[in-house]
Amino acid sequence: MSQKGKNKKWRSAGLYALLAIVLISLATTFLGNRPPERLEISYSDLISRVERGEVSKVLVETAPDGRQVAIAEAEINNRATQVQVNLPPLTPEFENTLVANGVELAVRPVQEEGLLGRILSTFFLPVLLLLGLFFLLRRAQNGPGSQALNFGKSRARVQMEPKTQITFNDVAGIDQAKLELAEVVDFLKNSERFTALGAKIPRGVLLVGPPGTGKTLLARAVAGEAGVPFFSISGSEFVEMFVGVGASRVRDLFEQAKQNAPCIVFIDEIDAVGRQRGAGLGGGNDEREQTLNQLLTEMDGFEGNSGIIVIAATNRPDVLDAALLRPGRFDRQVTVDRPDFQGRLEILKVHARGKTLSADVDLEKLARRTPGFTGADLANLLNEAAILAARRNLTEISMDEINDAVDRVLAGPEKKDRLMSERRKELVAYHEAGHALVGSLLPNYDPIQKVTIIPRGQAGGLTWFMPSDDDMGLTTRAHLKNMMTVALGGRVAEEVVYGESEITTGAASDLQQVARIARNMVTRFGMSDRLGNVALGRQYANIFLGREIAAERDFSEETAALIDEEVRRLVNEAYQRATYLIRENRALLDRIARRLVEAETIDGEELQAIIDNSEVVMLPPEEEPEPLTLPMAVNAGA
């Protein structure tokens, strides 16, 4: 534990101890010093009780002023009671009466305190302790890092000097976004160069992109490079259970920023506070909307915020309020997308620093194997590989650990404890061999990386393809048809080898994928000859954003029936192509399946060697076999 943590712990313990002492002192003062209750009687009544034998002891107290008081222990109503009597000056007759009746007599002086002494003894210690407790609470409240009672204060972390130890050299693969933010930092450092041309500093920069692409990392790099105060806060930290806290924290944040201008304010996950106002089924959220209104005012309201640059990050730009996105508030919207091949290679090089890699590790090959991976995915991938190497008591990270880490990240860990019967192993082998065979024989399809029958996650076996990211997200009609054909290869292999009555549920996810692709081809991509180049059906939107209350079907029942027919036609064509390839290459299918049963995993090079050493029948280049009319369980709503 740090010294600061120890001091805070001891301070808390001291607070509780002081509070306990105060409570005990107050209880002692007001409860412990109460004198016993006494019954006051007359002098003659006392003499009568002494003569009747009801008094056993008399204590005579003499005050400094000469006044005497007798305190007697008498029995009244069959109960022992203390009585008090104001006495005249003592006479021998009173003493003789007491002695004659066997009453014990004692005399003592009374030491009375003055008024000031009584006040001090009664109130001084409690008041002193309460004052000490008050000052201790004030000190704890205003201490560093303590927000015990300051609900309306901003919780932003402030860096007056760079402390993140991260610079733009640690950011790779997102060069365009890095350039935009580097320009903002340069504006703060060398503003004269820009103002000489009449340029104004941008008010805000919004970083938009999928999770894990490096938005927060960019902000940390800005904090390390800027050379100006850097305030960082999460959007969720503005709103609490108390009304008005969010707006108060926004005001306090920008008040601190104005005092330290020029500076940078970074708001992470701004969608937590910047959602559209008054949207959704449940109406608006008054507290969040009040916070958003205050944020809008501070960013570009009646009073300027010159010298303050707001950088915000979100992966949900579609839910943000339009007033927040306009120029003057967020002048720049920087898209931080998934990296391409070159970006992935640079990211891998950055995260490979400090890791001991063996000579066989090829980062370029790994970058080609991981299209669609974000920077966070790649960092996690190399970390998993390092953990696997340590688990295996190795001194270096080899390509085997990296390959296993890729499989682990994509599909989960191997289920080595799951014992499979020979029948199940053979069935899974034929299913995966069907995918691999069809994918290998289709023209211009993605190359196969690996085929395995070792279960991972929810899958009993997997066939890994290596998609290319050169097409920039564009997919052709031919490739979509090939995707459906490959997905149906496993079901067709089961049917060809074991018969229609022995097909299994292992193709459930394949059928869902096929139905989804076919329906999108018909209704979204305009790839149906009968329906033409039209997009049918309004797309679903998140109903809690106020965009759509329900999906609307903008076509007739006849068109809906035609859509179903076209979906079934596309699926049947893909099924027919897969059936043709597997029936015509049955011997090759058996060879691949037998090898899978033996080795459990074969890589793409070994699979290609098996295909090269076998007789192969390809699809006819011009005409395809007649479509088969087969009953298929196609989820038309997928």
UniProtKB/Swiss-Prot annotation:
What GO molecular-function term can you cite, just one?
ATP binding
Which SMART domains does the entry mention? AAA
Annotated residues for binding of ATP? 209-216
Q: Which ranges sit in the Lumenal compartment?
A: 33-114
Tell me which Gene Ontology terms the entry assigns under biological process.
protein catabolic process; proteolysis
EC number(s) given by UniProt = 3.4.24.-
Transmembrane segments annotated in the record for this chain: 12-32, 115-135
Q: What does this protein do?
A: Acts as a processive, ATP-dependent zinc metallopeptidase for both cytoplasmic and membrane proteins. Plays a role in the quality control of integral membrane proteins.
- Descriptive protein name: ATP-dependent zinc metalloprotease FtsH
Can you name the source organism? Synechococcus sp. (strain JA-2-3B'a(2-13))
| Gene expressing this chain | ftsH
